[in-house]
C-alpha cells in the first residue's frame, strides 16, 4: 500500500512507548512519542522540517531558546535547523 491511513488520535492515546515509528517514506516519517510528566525529548536539530501535534497533556516547546506553552490540540512546526526541545 502507498501512503498511510489510520486513526492517529487513537494510536497516540494508546501508545506507551517513548518512540514508535508508524510509517517511513523517502521524505517523511510518522512517529508517535509519549513523554511522561517531567520528561523531555532532549534538545535536537534536524535537517528537515518537523510537524508535531500534542494529543493530551500540557508542557513547553522550546524553539531556538524561545519557550512556548503547549497543551492538548497544539500544533508545532519546527523548521529545519532549529534547536528544539519538548
Describe the predicted segments one by one.
Residues 80-86:
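Ligand-binding loop in jelly-roll beta-barrel domains
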Residues 15-16, 31-46:
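Conserved short histidine dyad/triad with adjacent acidic residue
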Residues 65-80:
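Short acidic-glycine-tyrosine-enriched beta hairpin
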Residues 28, 37, 47, 66, ...:
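A generic "binding-loop/recognition-motif" signal
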Residues 32, 42, 51, 66-68:
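Short, surface-exposed secondary-structure edge patches
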Residues 49-60, 64:
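Glycine- and acidic-residue-biased ligand/ion/polar-headgroup-sensing regions
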Residues 1-27, 62, 77:
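A short, N-terminal "cap"/entry segment at the start of jelly-roll beta-barrel domains
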Amino acid at each position: 500500500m502507498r501512503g498511510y491511513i489510520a486513526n492517529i488520535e487513537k494510536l497516540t492515546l494508546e501508545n506507551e512507548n517513548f518512540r514508535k515509528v508508524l510509517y517511513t517514506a523517502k521524505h517523511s516519517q510518522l512517529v508517535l512519542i509519549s513523554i511522561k510528566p517531567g520528561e523531555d525529548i532532549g534538545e535536537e536539530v534536524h535537517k528537515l522540517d518537523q510537524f508535531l501535534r500534542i494529543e493530551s497533556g500540557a508542557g513547553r516547546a522550546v524553539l531556538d531558546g524561545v519557550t512556548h506553552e503547549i497543551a492538548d490540540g497544539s500544533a508545532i512546526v519546527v523548521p529545519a535547523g532549529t534547536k528544539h526541545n519538548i
